[in-house]
Regions:
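Walker A/P-loop nucleotide-binding motif
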Residues: 51-71
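A short, basic N-terminal segment
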Residues: 1-51, 268, 272
Length: 275
């Protein structure tokens, strides 16, 4: 199956005159569509960073959380902000600290207390010597163990100083909220000042999304009939990753039929290949 994918991709791209893969999930920053959701997330994150607090971003798998994070963080001036991005796992607090130490380009040193001191020292140096603000972004935060949430607030506490040194952005699935509601998570949860949730997009937004992705490939007209857009929206439930697969598959089906327009039947055919 893998061997057949590239010729199939080249065939539909050639048929529709596309300059690149359609509905590519790995878009460059300049090609990301700034939706109302993303604008709202940006505003909430700006507020979180100003306060040096904790912000949340939740959403189901494929809803576009990581893309939204990349876009929002790209708007932070690189000479002013040092962004530390960690993709969380279900490991211990020590493993989390090791990930953080690695991103800070520090040596993997000692026990937990030594690591905490080293992390805080590194953050202080960035803030005081480089005159930069540090923001910690934890993607897939819903994978984190409860005992890690119970201790995570310690790296935001700097003795004899109320200055907000380390704002944190936590991104994950909706069960992230459940984990933060545990009593042991309260020291961290009490620092949350902003919360965003990536909702599935509606039918109108889906049409804008499809047109945007077609334009990225160099196609200036809407190849999708109205009922095809509705079929993509209904079939994906408004989840962007599913919509990408469906829409691309429908383009392949249309090209195979030598049809310059994508119909609902092409979308349904694509759905049988994907789901």
């Amino acid at each position: 199956m893998e061997k057949g994918r590239e010729p199939m991709s080249a065939t539909y791209r050639s048929f529709f005159g596309m300059t690149r893969e359609a509905f590519d999930p790995d878009l460059g920053l300049k090609d990301i569509l700034e939706t109302q959701d993303i604008t709202s997330i940006r505003q909430r994150f700006d507020y979180t960073l100003r306060l040096g607090a904790v912000g949340l971003l939740t959403g189901e798998v494929g809803s576009g959380k990581s893309t939204a994070l990349r876009f929002v963080l790209s708007k932070l001036h690189p000479s002013e902000y040092k962004t530390i991005w960690i993709t969380a796992c279900s490991g211990s607090i020590l493993e989390f600290y090791r990930l953080l130490i690695s991103e800070l380009n520090m040596g993997n040193t000692g026990c937990k207390s030594v690591m905490i001191k080293s992390i805080k020292k590194s953050i202080r140096q960035i803030v005081l010597e480089k005159k930069m603000k540090v923001v910690l972004v934890v993607d897939e935060a819903s994978l984190i163990r409860l005992e890690v949430f119970a201790e995570l607030h310690t790296i935001t506490q700097f003795e004899q100083d109320s200055k907000p040194w380390l704002p944190i952005i936590l991104a994950g699935r909706s069960n992230l909220i459940d984990k933060l509601m545990y009593q042991t998570s309260m020291p961290l949860a009490s620092r949350i000042v902003a919360r965003s949730h990536m909702e599935p997009i509606n039918r109108q937004e889906m049409e804008q999304y499809i047109l945007h992705h077609l334009a990225i490939t160099g196609v200036k007209t809407n190849l999708f009939e109205d009922n095809a857009i509705t079929a993509v929206h209904q079939g994906s439930g408004g989840i962007l990753r599913k919509a990408n697969h469906l829409a691309r598959g429908a383009l392949v089906a249309a090209a195979k039929d030598q049809s310059m327009t994508v119909t609902a039947d092409h979308v349904r055919l694509a759905s049988t290949e994907i789901f």
